[in-house]
Each structure stands twice: as C-alpha cells, then as structure tokens.
C-alpha cells in the first residue's frame, strides 16, 4: 500500500480524527509546520479523538506541512532518503499525489503571498540515469564497495577487454619521470602472463629480503619497472595478486591489488576561509575544528603515502600542499607567510595565496566565510599556477574542504583533469531553519544564494565525497541528512531544485577521522602525561588572578567539573549549556562548570555572531549569579595543554559536554573520549553515531535543557553511590575510539578510495561529461552573477 493509499484508507476509517487534525493545523496561524509541530498536533488530537495506529504512522512520516486554506501540502519521508509529496483538501479529505515541483511551487506562493513567476528548475537526475547506483538505504555511504563490485563484474564479463584496460592503466603510471610497473607498456595479456610467470620463477630462487635495487636489472629485462615491491617477497606478493585477477577476477582481489599501486605521491588540499595556521588561530573567526582536522589528516596521510611508496619500492618522498588564503593583516598568527612547513611532517606544507580584486590589488583583511564567494575564481587561477610550481607537476588527488574549498577543488579538477574528493565538514543549509525558502531575508548577512549554489556545483562535480558519518549523508529515521536537504528545495525568485543530489550515488563514502593519538591519550597513562602542565591548568581553572582573560571563580574547588570547549557561536550553543546549568539548582550543587571559548570582552572580537554570544554569556552569569560556580576562559589553548586539560578533568571525575544545536561530526568529542572523559553530546548530527548511549557516553537534546540537566545530575549522583559507573563509561569511550576513530584507519581508507576511484575513472569513463556541461552552464549563468552582485554589495 502506498503512502497516499494509507492516508485515503485512514480518512475513510477515521474521518473525524483526520478532519480534527487538519483543522488544528489550519488554526495554528502558521503556514509552515515542522515535524515537531505536526506531531504535537497529533498528540493533542489523540486526546480528543482517541489513537489511530494508521494515522499515527502516517503523521510520524511527515517532515513538513504547508497550510493555506483550503489545501494542506505535505512532505513525507516514508524511508531514509526517500520522499513523497501530496496534498489534501480540508473539507473533501481526498489526498492527491504531487510532483516535487508542484509542492515547491505551492510553498513559494505561500511564503511570498503571491503567485511566483516562472523560475529556473535545476534537475541533475537525467544525467545519472545510466550510471550505477545503490538501491538500499543501508548501503548509502559505502559507494566504493558497491562501485567496485558493479564495475568489476561488468568489466571482467568481457575478459579480454577487461584485462587490456587493467594493463593499460598499469602502464601509464610514472612518478617524477620514473616509469612504474611496466617498462614496455605492453597490452598483450598473453605476453604479460609469460612475463609474470618468468619473474615469479626467478623470485622463488632468491632470498625474500633481496632488495629491489638488486632485482632491478633482471626485472627490467622481463619488462617490469619499480612499483611491485621493495624486496623479493613483496614483489612476488604483488605479482601473485595480479595473476589471481587475471585468472579469476573478484572485487576484493582487485581492491587489494589497486591498494598496492604507487599512484598517489602528490596531494593538493584546499581550505580557503578563516585563519589557517598551526599556532594562535583556534578560536579566531571561522577557525576551529576544520583546521585541526586537516592538520591531523595530513600527518596521517603523509605517513601512509610514504609507507605505501616505500613498501612498493618507489624511492620518492610524497608531498602534500594545504592551500589556504594569505592574510596580510594576520595579527599574531603566521597567516601572512606564503609557505609554512607542517610540524610533524617531512614534506607537507601550507601554501598561502592571497585574495585579489579584479584589478590585482591584494585584500589585506580577514573576510567572513559567508562573503568570500566573489574572490574564489581569481583565487583558483592563482592557486593553479602556484600549486603546480610547488608540486612540480599535477597533483594526483585534489581534496576540497567546506563549501568554498570544494568549489575551488571543482574549478581546479576541471582544469587539470585530476580526481576530486569533497569533504563538507558542515553544510550550512541544515543549520539555519528555512534558510532556503527565506534566503532573501538572510541574504545581507549570510549570502546563502552563493553558498547553496556552490554546494550544488561541488557535490555534483566530485568524483567521490567523504563524510564522517552516515547521518551527514542521509540522516536518521527521524531527521533528514545534510546532503539529503539538497535533494529538493526552493529559493524563490532564484531557482527551484527538483533533483539536486542523489544519495544513492556511489560517490558517497563514510571515512571517520580520529584524534591525534600523540596529544589525546588516556588519563590513566602516567608515563605519557605532561605533569609539568598541571600547575598551569590548576591556575587556569581555580586562580582568581586578574591577569587572565577569564570570568568567574570556583568557590568550591572539590566539586567535579563539567567541561566544554568550542567557538562562541549560536550553533555551538555554549550559552545554552550555561542556561540549563543555571536553571538547575540540583546540578549546580553537584558540579562546577568550566568553559573554554571565545573572548571575555566583546570588543576583542571582530565576528558579530560571537559578539552576540559574548553579551549573552555575561547576561546569564549576571542574572543567575554564576560567578562562584562557572569559570569562563576566553582564550585559546595549545594542543598539549588542551590534551592535558581533558585528562585533568578526568582525574577529577568530571565530564565533557558538547551541547551544539547541530554538529556534523565533533572532533572535540573524539578528543574527550580518547582521553577517557565521559562525554555528553548533542543527538543532532554525528555524535549520535559516535557515542553509544549509556555505553560510551550519553546523547542529549540541547532543546530540552531541563532533561539534559537532570541526565547529567543523575550521572554525578550515581557516581557518588558507585564510582565504578564513571569508570564504565570512561572505558567504553576509550574502546569506542580505538575501534572506529583513529587517523591510521582514516588514512588507509582514504588512500584506497583514491586509487579505486582513479582506476574506475580511467578505465570506464566515469567522467560524467554531460553533467559537467550542465554544471559549467550553471556556474557561469547562476553562480558567477550571484558572486559578482555580492562583490558590489560588500
């Protein structure tokens, strides 16, 4: 039975309840009702009319309702990533199926108060009809597994053609002018089989530890170049993998073999916005977890790239460039330096390229991430020239970060013909309620018209997209995912998206990051602890000296500590945590609250949203007289100090709280858990997957302050009765991180993904040429005019 049939049957059987429910919605004096509003209306109706299981099941599938007499337009999500649209007349109660376009057009009319003129409809759907796609929602985010199975099955169903494609792919690889794998680039499968047999026979007679340099003369005579292995054992292992594929190909064997090919030695990573540096930047505007993520990421990737190249006998030092914006007015940061080596790496560098105006003038000051769109096209051209010079050639992979970095990655990938990977970190669209339909009201402040257009361009251009969690793509049974919100939406008078992204596209892959294991390790490891930092930490938390950028003094220092650390912005919701703490006498009696974030003086911030949150913090502390129970540190901590602070809080049997209204992933959560600190984190976003509730931490609803305060208070009271409760959650957190969230696992997966997508792009024509033409037109006719208009407004 379809959803519309369900509603029709429900109306026949429970006409009074359906009519009463619709009447309640229409009299709510709101045209747009959210999921929570629709469910609240149902609960009230059930009190009057009794409960209908069928009606309840229907309403609990609703995501949104638009009510303008006499019609109710409804958006339903019967399954993850699958949507239906319908309307029902408030008097006749006969449901009718709608197209996406009809639903969005009605929504626009209701919001604007008048019929909308014809606008551009954006539809990427037709371009992907012939492309392999997943069918089950549970498989979303496992794209490379599906793609490898699907395409290897098709490829090797034509054995000769498949073998030829594979050999052609192996024959084109070279690094710094050095030919790899095959020296003669033979496509004759029979000749290659003979070469492999002869090589393996020879290798059997040698000591397995014989290095490649001694093998090279004989291997060269047989047609083999470096890349098979660093010694005889590894060469034989790699050659046997290829022989197995030629004999009886399978997706797993192909993936294992491709992971051995030394095809990634130069990596370009893009992160334009904010203050990207290694010191004195965290907490500055638009500068937070993404910087930490990338710096930890490149350390792991460089090591993985180096180890793989060495294992395959390729004596080349890999190079990684992180490209960001050069800011001449950089304060006490290094963001005005063109080139900076990344500490802990051998050949990884931060390359800074300035934003320039059309006349070539360099822009000296920081620019909000919401206002950088006019500068990215010129920036991309400058980056292309400087990055190629630094790398000594084309990169093997381009990784974009956030909306701006992904757009620049799109421009560069198109020009250079290089595999493109996108990492969104956080898509703004799900952070701001109705930010698409009311985009015009937000335009002066956030310029979402540019950002959402850039997002559509980048996500449809990418060869593969990496996310930290499943929810980031497709949400949960209850709520839509970040990428899912781009499937269909409307920006009145601009364009209407009826198919923006396909969540079942195999480009989506979940690869979760970790915490730096050298910095964030268990509190119970005394030999690695930085004991010399303890006096400084105690001074930060307990000292009432006036020379610190702090407010509040903890009158009772023996209480356990509730700790939080984040930027001061509305979404991070630190003021929400302070408010729920202030409103709970029980929680205030059990624990003190320690906050690290933002500035104490709003005049020291240049970010308007941060300034608002600073004022709100002071207001809450004044109103609730919190100065003896809350310690607020308006400062940035270096990594070692932050790591030891987590462990010090754990020593005191405290907890970490992450109260964000939404969190795409949550690196601070991983850091806290890796330190053994019990963690309470928002249920909205990635933390719902990271934390196993009541096993490795706790989920909280930041919109339910009283319930959150009670949950935390219950935990502290249980610990007083049974200290083993704290130990149980602490150990659960450590186990969870070790099994799922480490940078070593991340780097291994990223390198495998890049090789597989590079291979399939080469052998099967995954260029999506038609889509690229459409995207090119969309960029020039839609994004560029929006960016130019913004340039004249700011």
UniProtKB/Swiss-Prot annotation:
TM region(s), chain numbering: none
Regulation of this protein's activity per its record: Inhibited by GDP over 10 mM and by over 2 mM MgCl(2).
Temperature optimum or stability note: Optimum temperature is 75 degrees Celsius. Retains about 55% activity after 15 minutes at 65 degrees Celsius.
Record region (GT-B glycosyltransferase): 263-742
Comment on pH dependence: Optimum pH is 5.0.
GO annotation, biological process: sucrose metabolic process
EC annotation from Swiss-Prot or TrEMBL: 2.4.1.13
Name listed for the protein in its UniProt record: Sucrose synthase
Originating gene: ss2
